Structure formats: structure tokens, C-alpha cells
Amino acid sequence: MPFLITIPAHAEWTRYAQLAESEEWFDPAIVRRDQDRITFWTMTNYTAPITSLEGQELLSEQALTTVDCSLGKIGSEKVIKYAGKNAQGAIIGSMETTLRMTKVSANAADRILLEIICAK
């Protein structure tokens, strides 16, 4: 069954990781919850421009992210790429895919995110 998902216009972003190449943020507002699966928006700000598959430079992206708290998995089904930081500026690309989830490793930044979201 199709459903409409909107991009958070006035999200209250919370930083959960500072890496050498990026800052990782999440919006604590839950888009959807289905038992142990929680869907919400994440945002990545890159410290330096990266080149997209389309050959354009981007500084940030948002992803519609789902975690499975019982299985310790994470995945994204929609990604929107922006020319500027904080999901600002021109949208230079987007992609929607079928949700494929992967196991989160113990020392990954996504482990921090999983623990925060699953504690809600």
C-alpha cells in the first residue's frame, strides 16, 4: 500500500556522531512505528564536498531511515542529496529503493543511533 512521506521542514535535529568526514544527525520525531521497527529521518553533513553518482558535488543528504530494534539492523529507503549543508540549497538528486536492512556493527556510528532510537 503506498503512503506519503514528507521531508521534515522544521526538524529538531540531534547530532549523534562527529566523524572525520561527516556529522551525523537524526530527527527525534518518529515517522512510523511498527512493533520493533522505527522509521525516522537522518541527515549527514559532509566536512568537504563529495561527488554524487550524477557527477555533482553535495554537502549534505537526508535519508528516511528504519531501524529494527530487536534485530539490530538499519536501512534507508529514500535519500535526498543537497548542494548545501543542513539539507539546504538545491536538491541535486534523490533516490527511492526497497528497504534493505543490514546488521549494525558494534563500533559503528549507527550503533549509537540504534541505541538512542530504540530507547524511545
PLM feature segments, named:
Residues M1-T6:
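Bacterial N-terminal signal peptides
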Residues P8-K120:
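N-terminal secretory-pathway/extracellular module detecting exported/lumenal segments
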